[in-house]
C-alpha cells in the first residue's frame, strides 16, 4: 500500500491594511485576542471556523497558521478581513492577495528504517543525522525545495513546500530512492 500525505499545517500570509493599531484592535472587539508588546510584537487571534490562528502585526501584515488546506487558509483570512471591517476598523483590504509560506505534511512508510544505512546510502551532501541531538534524519531536497525528516519508525515529516504538491513530490522522491537502494523492507 502506497503511503499517503496528510497535510498537518498551512502557513499563509497577506497584508490586510496599510497598518494596524494593535491596541485599538484589542480594545474594539476582537474577542479573545491576546497582545503583549513586551513579549511579542504581534497580536494573536484565533477562530474556530475554519480553525486557524492569526498573528497580526502593526505593519498590516497577517500570518495565518493551523489550517489543513490552502482553501481554508484563504477562507480564514477573508473571514478575518470581514470581521475587522465589521467591527469598524477602517482601511481593511477585503480581497487580500494570499501567499502560502509553508506546507507541513506527514506520511508513514509503514516500515522501520535503519537511519545509519540511509545516511550511508544518501551521502552527507544533503543529509544531516545526529541521533544524540535529534532522533530523525534531515534530508534536504533541491527540487522541490522541501526538507524531509525521516524517523526510524518509517514516519516522515515534510516541510517547506509552497503547495501540497511539493510535499507529495518530496514523498515520491524519497520513497523511490529508499526503494531503489533496497532500504524499504
From Swiss-Prot:
Sequence repeat start and end residues: 7-84, 100-178
Keyword match DNA-binding: yes
Keywords assigned by UniProt, alphabetized: DNA-binding, Repeat, Transcription, Transcription regulation
InterPro entries associated with the record: TBP (IPR000814), TBP_CS (IPR030491), TBP_dom_sf (IPR012295)
A molecular function (GO) term: DNA binding
Keyword Zinc among record annotations: no
Gene Ontology biological process terms in this record: DNA-templated transcription initiation
Family as reported in the entry's similarity comment: Belongs to the TBP family.
Function according to Swiss-Prot or TrEMBL: General factor that plays a role in the activation of archaeal genes transcribed by RNA polymerase. Binds specifically to the TATA box promoter element which lies close to the position of transcription initiation.
Protein name: TATA-box-binding protein 2
Organism encoding this protein: Methanosarcina acetivorans (strain ATCC 35395 / DSM 2834 / JCM 12185 / C2A)
Amino acid at each position: 500500500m502506497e503511503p499517503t500525505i496528510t497535510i498537518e499545517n498551512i502557513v499563509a500570509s497577506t497584508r490586510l491594511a496599510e497598518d494596524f493599531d494593535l491596541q485599538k484592535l484589542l480594545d474594539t472587539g476582537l474577542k479573545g485576542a491576546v497582545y503583549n508588546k513586551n513579549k511579542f510584537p504581534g497580536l494573536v487571534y484565533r477562530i474556530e471556523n475554519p480553525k486557524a490562528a492569526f498573528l497580526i502585526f502593526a505593519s498590516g501584515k497577517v500570518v495565518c497558521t493551523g489550517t489543513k488546506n490552502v482553501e481554508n487558509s484563504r477562507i480564514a483570512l477573508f473571514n478575518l478581513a470581514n470581521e475587522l471591517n465589521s467591527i469598524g476598523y477602517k482601511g481593511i483590504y477585503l480581497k487580500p492577495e494570499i501567499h502560502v509560506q509553508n506546507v507541513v505534511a506527514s506520511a508513514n512508510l509503514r516500515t522501520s528504517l535503519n537511519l545509519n544505512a540511509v545516511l550511508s546510502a544518501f551521502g552527507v551532501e544533503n543529509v544531516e543525522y545526529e541521533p544524540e541531538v535529534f532522533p530523525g534524519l534531515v534530508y534536504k531536497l533541491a527540487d522541490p525545495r522541501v526538507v524531509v525528516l525521516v524517523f526510524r519508525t518509517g514516519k516522515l515529516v515534510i516541510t517547506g513546500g509552497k503547495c501540497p504538491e511539493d510535499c507529495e513530490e518530496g514523498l515520491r522522491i524519497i520513497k523511490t530512492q529508499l526503494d531503489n537502494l533496497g532500504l524499504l523492507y
